[in-house]
């Protein structure tokens, strides 16, 4: 049972920050800075690999490991960068230290280091997992100040201002986090976690949860997870060019779609009801038939893709989506298999309404920093309830007893380092996947209503937005549509695939000499902007050179630095069938 937290022991805990400066090849470090709010220190060397004992990274860690501290060490985007340098150095230079890494996808969410002999402990965290934005934007938002300007990064290691640049990064991050923690505790009534999602959950339980939330059965959990789909993202038409009859392409976006969905009654307590009851709140495993139509709305997982096809298939569907598909004349239920239904309750309205008021710019107490915090908290909570039960932890040089008792599996490492992975299945009281599944289903229903309204005039959609030449009714309330580019309309667009498109607007953007929006998720180089012609190159079948920085597993395998590869947009199995004129139709499926 998920119970509210008392919040009696809430307090802001001390912390420290660090930052590194590297050469542009991202393989050698020459400066490391550290700040705790009172004292600032830095270490300098020639540009050297982090595993070199004379490197600035090794100097910093040597000092840090000689000084036990309970303060977590924060670096912004450290889980993808700074902590990876630290890990490479620790593996090769400190054989007496054990390391425990909690990964989040390929990033380091948390890295714990312990001295086997003295049992001193240190903890490295990534502040970007709590505040997901660039340090420049966060500095402007929280402190009204950014990073040092007009720096040539390629020559920074030769620039006398490198010391000023590093110190500003350290002090800026510390000041941002200090203000963040103060606002979180004093204004939001929150409690800090190691990520935005864990912080949102702790905040909800501390100040907004009014009743315990019961656990659900394994049967209900299985069906809820099977009916938990992500957002809908796909193109419907390839290209838009403005003309006399159709002057602009609109981008309509749902105002705070998931917070809007959270204000609805949520599935809480499992009901002892069997059979086919789509009028209830729950999830139904059934075989359906979706007739030919331009815009089917029921989700289908196949070939590692989320499709919205026509045809016949078996799946687990939320009752809200099933009702909408049947009411619109698209779907027929051919066979019922099993189901789970829930008693509902309004459990999030207080949380949403309170935080959303912080985003009201007409409020005389409006503050940009707390507005940003409220937005993060509103969008981070619902997914936490759908967390997976299987977790992985990476261990470097674990004790023999831990290796045996935790049934760790060895990871191959040419470095000759004992590396193991621990996989555990742990059910926590907050794992209530029916809540996450229901909220995302309500969001897809809201998007589907818009897609059905614009029909064949839809060009593209992405979770909570629709690009279309048709008009949708707009408003400022939660869940209503807004025209995202009403002040700078789109007069040309090309949609290649999900998250890969280019838009041309009527005017240049503020503080920019360009009127182009260029998106190609997964095709950029590390810390570099996309080339201006990226989408056109991908559309012609060419590949782009992409790069990524080594992650924790790569370091364990002996790889470090920037890794380059060629990547192209695979169009052999798109979510829809596209025709030569740029129009499309849904795919047909037929499976049980």
Regions found by a protein language model. Give the residues of each.
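Conserved acidic
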Residues: 11-17, 25-592
